[in-house]
Amino acid sequence: MSEVLRLENVTRRFEEGEGQLEVFSGLNMTLNAGEIVALVGPSGAGKSSLLHMAGLLEAPTSGEIHVEGVAASKLPDAERTRIRRQTIGFVYQAHHLLPEFDAAENVILPQMIAGKAKAEAAAEARRLLTTLGLGARLTHRPSQLSGGEQQRVAIARALANKPKILLADEPTGNLDPRTAGGVFDSLIAITRSQGLAALIATHNFDLAARMDRALLLHQGRLVEGAELPR
């Protein structure tokens, strides 16, 4: 499998008072095409910061982020933004859907911002939402959708511009266990069907165990192959 994302000796520190808080140090990891990897760890371990750096939303204090072979973390802002928009899709714990737009429009809009014609964007939105079980809910606004349905729209939006990499930060964290399981199944199925690489942060060890492999972020270090509590 070809490598699509690599973190090389990455360290992240934040200013705190007169000193610095080191979230993690010397992290190394790779993500290959078509691979779905769980990122687990306790609250405050730095999972969100790691995903933000992997998605070129934050720069590491030191080290490098390689996206499809390109050393990207120190590139100019405009070039990092271009790589991010062309390559990476994001799903967050909060769906961040635009309340004034319906489900289809929330998926159409980012495609049109990227330059796609409206008819083509609408067809892709319809395809993705139907695949995710929302074919009858295209014209419903977020307030008319359940929590699980809202998160499915967010997944469709993340995939609409055909990224190579999907980064998901606790995508089912706000849902009850039964709904979370259904949304997770949909996320994994559509990710695999499109051949994407995915890095998914979760506190749910049962869900993590269903992915291809798991990385444990603990005390500033990544541990691969750690035995997960069940």
Task: Indicate residue ranges for each PLM-predicted region.
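ABC family nucleotide-binding domain
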Residues: 3-222
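ABC ATPase nucleotide-binding domains
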Residues: 229-230
